Curated annotation (Swiss-Prot):
GO terms for molecular function: ribonuclease P activity; zinc ion binding. The keyword Metal-binding applies. Disulfide bonds: none annotated. Zn(2+) binds at C65, C68, C94, C97. It is an enzyme of class 3 (hydrolase). Keywords: Cytoplasm, Endonuclease, Hydrolase, Metal-binding, Nuclease, tRNA processing, Zinc. It comes from Methanococcus vannielii (strain ATCC 35089 / DSM 1224 / JCM 13029 / OCM 148 / SB). It holds the Pfam family Rpr2. This is Ribonuclease P protein component 4. It catalyses: Endonucleolytic cleavage of RNA, removing 5'-extranucleotides from tRNA precursor. Belongs to the eukaryotic/archaeal RNase P protein component 4 family. GO terms for biological process: tRNA 5'-leader removal.
Length: 109
């Protein structure tokens, strides 16, 4: 049983490294105006996370549009606003599909 656990931990570490590499590639390709290749890299990284049954890393989760699957670079293909109408939150709008994300801001004590 210990051997299986070690194998799973090792494979999850490899999967995390590959996800990071693919997401960095997606970021570079989007800056070079290659949107389709960037979407393919995002899709591949999501498939790796699903196959390994692990959650997608939080640092990358908010950089992907949940509607169209494109990688978001703030100011280039997405806009970011801070609103405080009913509650304080960050509004991220994907400029490709016009999908809106709201991320609540926790108040510090």
């Amino acid at each position: 049983m210990k051997l299986k656990k070690k194998f799973l931990e090792k494979s999850k570490n490899i999967a995390n490294e590959r996800i990071d590499i693919l997401m960095n590639f997606a970021q570079k390709e989007l800056r070079c105006e290659k949107k389709e290749r960037s979407k393919n890299y995002v899709l591949l990284s999501k498939k790796i996370a699903m196959r390994m049954r692990m959650p997608f890393p939080k640092e990358w989760r908010r950089r992907i549009c949940k509607n169209c699957g494109s990688f978001l670079i703030y100011g280039k293909n997405s806009s970011v606003r801070i609103k405080s109408k009913n509650y304080s939150h960050v509004v991220i709008t994907c400029l490709e599909c016009k999908h809106i994300f709201r991320i609540p801001i926790k108040k510090s004590k």
